[in-house]
């Protein structure tokens, strides 16, 4: 039974990721006053499958000077981590109920840095290496903010268990008392997933395509799949942490439906930002984090630690 659940979850995520790619291309098309993909299948609905077929049937070329093992392992590692992160998410019942679910997500998502680092270094290309250095610095930097925001959230929730967040938000969303945290979290997730306006790693005018410049065919597709899977995951986390859905034990499908709608709306916001905003300069990106977000999240963390002590109120203990 657990194997069937795992397969169903994986298949659902991969199908959602495929159609997210199509949706993005459609939205970008309409914002630029054109149609987007509309040839393959009705309204272009079969375009993701045509792309997958094309990429996975092509010969995966490899630079002769590359480090073979790391070059091959990196894309597979990126997608594996992206799928692994879904296991502790309660929708409303998680695949694996972890007491330290938030910590697991934080620790596992930080491993994505290795796939980026290996892919750029193993490619033996200057463009890929510069893209890698940018991506790694950006990802590691914004993880600090995400960790501090999660720490503030679990001080309000009282547990590392993600299922507790559903109980915490029975009466009102955490978005209402902690909207500055939610705003910084959302912007940090944009940076963490290397999305516009923070897509410095894929600065086409400077770096060709970033850390995946030397990749083609299947491995290239795996990187893209990992990126879009991470986008859905980050929005699912945002919906779970700040826009919690009340769970009625008699109708779990209602919880799942509402949770999915919230995730879809947040993902649409990601796509709207992609089609609207220009790319930041690299120094502005780092300035935003180290000079603005970090002091503010630290101040809010101190506030969330000191307030319960001052008022002799403690969060629910599990």
Swiss-Prot record:
GO terms for cellular component: mitochondrial inner membrane. One of its GO terms (biological process) is mitochondrial respiratory chain complex I assembly. InterPro entries: NADH_UbQ_OxRdtase_su1/FPO (IPR001694), NADH_UbQ_OxRdtase_su1_CS (IPR018086). It is a multi-pass membrane protein. Its main location: mitochondrion. The keyword Transmembrane applies. PROSITE patterns: COMPLEX1_ND1_1, COMPLEX1_ND1_2. It is found in: Mitochondrion inner membrane. It is an enzyme of class 7 (translocase). It catalyses: a ubiquinone + NADH + 5 H(+)(in) = a ubiquinol + NAD(+) + 4 H(+)(out). Its EC number is 7.1.1.2. Disulfide bonds: none annotated. One of its GO terms (molecular function) is NADH dehydrogenase (ubiquinone) activity. The chain crosses the membrane at residues 2-22, 69-89, 100-120, 146-166, 171-191, 222-242, 253-273, 294-314. Keywords: Electron transport, Membrane, Mitochondrion, Mitochondrion inner membrane, NAD, Respiratory chain, Translocase, Transmembrane, Transmembrane helix, Transport, Ubiquinone. Core subunit of respiratory chain NADH dehydrogenase (Complex I) which is composed of 45 different subunits. Belongs to the complex I subunit 1 family. Core subunit of the mitochondrial membrane respiratory chain NADH dehydrogenase (Complex I) which catalyzes electron transfer from NADH through the respiratory chain, using ubiquinone as an electron acceptor. Essential for the catalytic activity and assembly of complex I. This is NADH-ubiquinone oxidoreductase chain 1. It comes from Pongo pygmaeus.
């Amino acid at each position: 039974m657990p194997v069937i659940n795992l397969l169903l979850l994986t298949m659902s995520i991969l199908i959602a990721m495929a159609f997210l790619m199509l949706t993005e291309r459609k939205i970008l098309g309409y914002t630029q006053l054109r149609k987007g993909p509309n040839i393959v299948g009705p309204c272009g609905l079969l375009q993701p499958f045509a792309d997958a077929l094309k990429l996975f049937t092509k010969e995966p070329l490899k630079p002769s000077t590359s480090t073979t093992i790391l070059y091959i392992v990196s894309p597979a590692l990126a997608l594996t981590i992206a799928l692994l992160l879904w296991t502790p998410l309660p929708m409303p019942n998680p695949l694996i109920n972890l007491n330290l679910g938030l910590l697991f997500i934080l620790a596992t998502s930080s491993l994505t840095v290795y796939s980026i680092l290996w892919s750029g270094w193993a490619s033996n290309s200057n463009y890929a290496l510069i893209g890698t250095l940018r991506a790694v610095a950006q990802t590691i930097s914004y993880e600090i903010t995400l960790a501090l925001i999660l720490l503030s959230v679990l001080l309000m929730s009282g547990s590392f268990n993600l299922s507790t967040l559903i109980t915490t938000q029975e009466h009102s969303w955490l978005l209402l008392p902690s909207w500055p945290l939610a705003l910084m979290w959302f912007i940090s997730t944009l940076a963490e997933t290397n999305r516009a306006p923070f897509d410095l790693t894929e600065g086409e005018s400077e770096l060709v395509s970033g850390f995946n410049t030397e990749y083609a065919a299947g491995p290239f597709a795996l990187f893209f799949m990992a990126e879009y899977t991470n986008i859905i995951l980050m929005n699912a986390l945002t919906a779970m942490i700040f826009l919690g859905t009340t769970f009625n034990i008699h109708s779990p499908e209602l919880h799942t439906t509402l949770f999915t709608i919230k995730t879809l709306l947040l993902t649409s916001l990601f796509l709207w930002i992609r089609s609207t905003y220009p790319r930041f300069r690299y120094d502005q990106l780092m300035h935003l984090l180290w000079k603005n977000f970090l002091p503010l999240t630290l101040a809010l963390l101190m506030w969330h630690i000191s307030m319960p002590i001052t008022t002799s109120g403690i969060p629910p203990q599990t």
